[in-house]
UniProtKB/Swiss-Prot annotation:
Stable up to about 51 degrees Celsius. This is DELTA-actitoxin-Afr1e. One of its GO terms (cellular component) is nematocyst. N-acetyl-D-glucosamine 6-sulfate binds at Y51, R53, Y138. Keywords: Cytolysis, Ion transport, Lipid-binding, Membrane, Nematocyst, Secreted, Target cell membrane, Target membrane, Toxin, Transmembrane, Transport. An N-(acyl)-sphingosylphosphocholine 4 binds at Y133, Y138.
Amino acid sequence: SADVAGAVIDGAGLGFDVLKTVLEALGNVKRKIAVGIDNESGRTWTAMNTYFRSGTSDIVLPHKVAHGKALLYNGQKNRGPVATGVVGVIAYSMSDGNTLAVLFSVPYDYNWYSNWWNVRVYKGQKRANQRMYEELYYHRSPFRGDNGWHSRSLGYGLKSRGFMNSSGHAILEIHVTKA
């Protein structure tokens, strides 16, 4: 399949070059993000929803992501002369009955804010919403988009490793693997 937002690709193929291609497809937008999430969890993921605190996406969240595959997604600030970034949470139901949630935050104003990201497994099925955003952004030790790799145990037999840059043209690459 093509390296475009909304696609599911082989997990081994996920990398910065693919995410840059997804990002460039958004064109000349001041605040945008390309997201790639590699499923090496041993579980199948089914899309639930994306909650946008600010910004939007023209892309439908890839519906099924099998083990060994990676999803590609994007987001951008709202069109027009509005001072917003692109901030949201993606939620996937996993075949074990739990929910994988991924936060991304690309602010408009870097004088006051930085890029942030987070990943967490919730018990049971939970759709992304404002409450989940607040929890992941303020209370669950998010990672700064600091051009470095970060790892964390997610519980439920899983761990994550991810990278986010510090630019307004952001890339977020996350690998979810068996612990």
